[in-house]
Amino acid sequence: MKTDTIDQPKTFVNTRMKSLFVAQDKKPATLREINLARLTPFQRGLLVMDGTVTRFIEAYTFAPVKVVLLQQRKQILSTEHPWLQLPAGEEVISRQVTLQTPVQEKSVPIIHTYADSLIVPQRLPKSILDGLKSDKQGLGRLLRCSGLEARRELLWCGIETLSDLPSAVAHLEGENFINRAYLVFANQEPLMLINEKFPFE
């Protein structure tokens, strides 16, 4: 069986993956390398796409995706945040959501994504800030509806064993998830750092 990981050199897949994730060598120590051959086409699509994850999941599952807001709060950075280009003492918004679809004849929905974001409010237009007050819209949809010209920059990816989760998704602790991190830029400034986690099994 193939055991390609992003760290392996001189294959088309790994060369291409390294070109997509610009900071793979700086991924957190808690992330393990991904065995690319073990991913399904759906998982590979989620890993590398630079569009709206919600739309992709809806197209794949033929089901409406519900954005469930788990937690959102303002916090003050205790140290400098180099990825967001912010000094210590700046205010950010911490936001955690799940993207899930209903299952017929079952009360428990399927969780496709758990997303943890740090957002720089002073760099966002009022329409997005107002939209953040709703628990029914994902960040991708808010960005698109705002008309803001934004781009995504993929940073790193890996396999993560989830821990320290909000109570609503605490049952996922100990499970392995595919993790990817990326920045959203507009006007040459980072607006948010997003960590998206997708079920591995």
Residue locations for each model-derived region?
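N-terminal domain-onset segments
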Residues: 2-178, 184-201
